[in-house]
Structures are given as structure tokens and as C-alpha cells.
């Protein structure tokens, strides 16, 4: 994996969007599976990556939370309910940029999305409970 080539390609994108409102920047590890990006890297790999991320001392902040997420896929709307804080948010996620990198052993996806706070009535298609690690 040529990390410098990835940084050279995504840093200008990050710099262009970092001061915009409601922006999410995400880096995902996984494998291209046809037209999908499959982030199921296996439990052992996930634990090794998470251990390495937690070890790094330079993060501005680290946060782990358990949330229930309800999705309306056709409108890209999701409700996040944080069990610890009781906070609920509803956002509409709009993809801004996706950059994919074929690497070995895992591929990398860099995403920028606009997460616009919204409200209204939506029928939710599915629910997932996630433990989220944010750095």
C-alpha cells in the first residue's frame, strides 16, 4: 500500500472541504466486491486496526459510543439514537466525493459527505445497533 500516494490524492480534497458546514470525512477499509465496497474485514483484522488507532497519541479526541441507527434508504435519511446521552439526530446524507484505492491486503475508500440536519416523517427501512469509534 502506497500511503503517500493516497495522502497526495486525498489531502487537496480534504483541504477543500474541511471548513464547510455539516461535512463528514470518513476513511474505510474493506474490499471491492463488484460495485459494492464491503467493509467486513473480519473480527481479527478489525481488532488489530482498532488497537493501532487507539494506540496513536495525536488524535484531537477519541470517542466510543453505542447507537441505534434507523435508515430510510430511498431518501438517504437516518436517525441516530445515542444510548448513553439520550440524544437523537436526524440527518440526510449526501455524498460529495468518493475516492477508492486498490491496495493489498485491504482496499481503502476516502469519502466526503454532507450530513444535513433534517426533520419530517419518514418510514424507516431498517435498524442497526452500532458501536462507533470516532477519532
Give a label for each model feature.
Residues 1-135:
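Phosphate-end processing signature that detects enzymes handling 5′-triphosphorylated RNA
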Amino acid at each position: 500500500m502506497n500511503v503517500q500516494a493516497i495522502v497526495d490524492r486525498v489531502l487537496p480534497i480534504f483541504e477543500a472541504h474541511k471548513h464547510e458546514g455539516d461535512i463528514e470525512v470518513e476513511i474505510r477499509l474493506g474490499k471491492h466486491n463488484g460495485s459494492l465496497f464491503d467493509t467486513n474485514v473480519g473480527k481479527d483484522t478489525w481488532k488489530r486496526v482498532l488497537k493501532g488507532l487507539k494506540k496513536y497519541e495525536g488524535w484531537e479526541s477519541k470517542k466510543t459510543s453505542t447507537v441505534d441507527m434507523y435508515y430510510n434508504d430511498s431518501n438517504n435519511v437516518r436517525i441516530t439514537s445515542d444510548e448513553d446521552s439520550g440524544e437523537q439526530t436526524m440527518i440526510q446524507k449526501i455524498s460529495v466525493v468518493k475516492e477508492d484505492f486498490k491496495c493489498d491486503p485491504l482496499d481503502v475508500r476516502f469519502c466526503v459527505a454532507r450530513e444535513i440536519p433534517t426533520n419530517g416523517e419518514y418510514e424507516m427501512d431498517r435498524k442497526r445497533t452500532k458501536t462507533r469509534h470516532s477519532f
